[in-house]
Curated annotation (Swiss-Prot):
EC supergroup of this enzyme: ligase
Cofactors, names only: Zn(2+)
Organism of this sequence: Stutzerimonas stutzeri (strain A1501) (Pseudomonas stutzeri)
Binding site for Zn(2+): 189, 199, 202, 205
Binding site for ATP: 10-20
Cofactor remark: Binds 1 zinc ion per subunit.
A Gene Ontology molecular function term of the record: zinc ion binding
Name of the protein in its database record: 7-cyano-7-deazaguanine synthase
């Protein structure tokens, strides 16, 4: 019997850690992929390593990219301040085409591994309004994946799974806690320091804090 494999995008944050735990619970052999893309919050990479180890993934890859060479985002260009108050429209923390790039590389690895499922922790309920977190984007990428690959053309097919898509942050936290995720290991803050401590002010910090509060669970986040 063939092993059921999945490639999972793992940023080191709360959502992606939960997705790894969910995939493992569903019986997948988990292969996780993180990206060192020039992000200001590089502490998330150490968090991803910790999560991958805690959840006993088969293999964890860190891919180097130079998205700060493109810029255009507060996460990759330190001359753009990370907003510390809610904003209208798509915020400056949006990284141009990031999820398209990340999923494309995950797709390549999945094809090599013979994995047919790719998991991503995007969410369209408690989220920052990024266009590449919407269900329409996920569905469109899946169609493209099955048109653009040898495996897809030969009928083996890929599925892009976004199991958090319609969950609130509180629901995500409760689910991950039940599955044994140690959220103290994760880093969500857009401007976390080198030790992984959070600012408590950015959009990601606010969503995370509200999720734990609504879930009625202790927030293990460390702040600077």
């Amino acid at each position: 019997m063939n092993e059921k494999k999945a490639v999972i995008l793992l940023s080191g944050g709360l959502d992606s850690a939960t997705v790894v735990a969910m995939a493992r619970d569903e019986g997948y052999a988990c292969y996780t992929m993180s990206f060192d893309y020039g992000q200001r919050h590089r502490a998330e990479l150490q968090a991803a390593e910790r999560v991958a180890k805690q959840l006993a993934v088969v293999e964890h890859k860190v891919i180097g990219l130079n998205l700060n060479g493109i810029g255009g985002s507060a996460l990759t260009d330190t001359s753009i301040d990370v907003p510390e108050a809610p904003s209208e429209g798509i915020p400056v923390t949006y990284v141009p085409a990031r999820n398209t790039v990340f999923l494309s590389l995950a797709l390549g690895w999945a094809e090599v591994l013979g994995a047919r499922d790719i998991f991503i922790g995007v969410n369209a309920v408690d989220y920052s309004g990024y266009p590449d977190c919407r269900p329409e984007f996920v569905a469109a990428f899946e169609r493209m994946a099955n048109l653009a690959t040898k495996a897809g053309v030969e009928g083996q097919g890929f599925r892009i799974q976004a199991p958090l898509q319609n969950l609130s942050k509180a629901q995500i936290v409760r689910k991950g806690s039940r599955l044994g995720v140690d959220y103290a290991m994760t880093v969500s803050c857009y401007q976390a320091d080198d030790d992984g401590r959070a600012c408590g002010k950015c959009d990601s910090c606010r969503l995370r804090s509200a999720g734990f509060a609504e879930a009625g669970l202790a927030d293990p986040t460390r702040y600077f």
